[in-house]
Amino acid sequence: MDELGPAELARGRTALKRRQITDAALALFLRNGYDKTSMDQIAADAGVSKQTVYKQFADKETLFEEIARGVTGKSDHILDELTAIAQTPVSTGDDLRKTLQRLARRYLDAVMEQPVLSLRRLIIAEADQFPELASHYYQQGPQRGLDLIESALRRWSEQGLLAAPDLRLAASQFAYLVLGSSQDHALFQSGQTPRPAERTRIAKAAASMFLAAYGR
């Protein structure tokens, strides 16, 4: 294997420092909020000089936006898991009920993850100052989740398993049946989330109520 040259080593060191900065900044933003986090604190926690931080990021706003967009982009694997569940072959009402329960449980688990809750809380708090970032977060997270659910409902409706005249509304209703007060409770009560058994109960109830309204 060829040894790395000076340029490659320099790029590697730069990338490492950049990662140290973004990791430290994310932890501080989530813990203290945007306004109460300073570039001095970020530099100290990252173990670099403030000059190094400013060499990588023009200002705190730029750093915050890059971090938030980067974390939001990591939701792809969750959506892939939800898509795989939603694409499970379904041919009977019982199949549909089981698939809805699995979809509901994974959806609830994803939203109840502490990093997700912390980021959501932070984005909401800074939405007025960063409206485009808040919009990006919504489009990449909640909206994509609803799009996925709507697509699954359309397929099941075409199979004759559901009768929902407004699929987007039905997708929103399913999402709220799943998340409901659990999400609000977790956001406003320091991340307190339902225990596994309660999540299963919520998922089953959501599937049952949804099918009571739209099942054939």
Question: What name fits each language-model region?
Answer:
Residues 98, 109-118, 122-124, 131-158, ...:
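Amphipathic alpha-helical packing segments from all-alpha helical-bundle domains
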Residues 1-8, 102, 143, 147, ...:
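C-terminal peripheral helix-coil segments that are non-catalytic and often amphipathic
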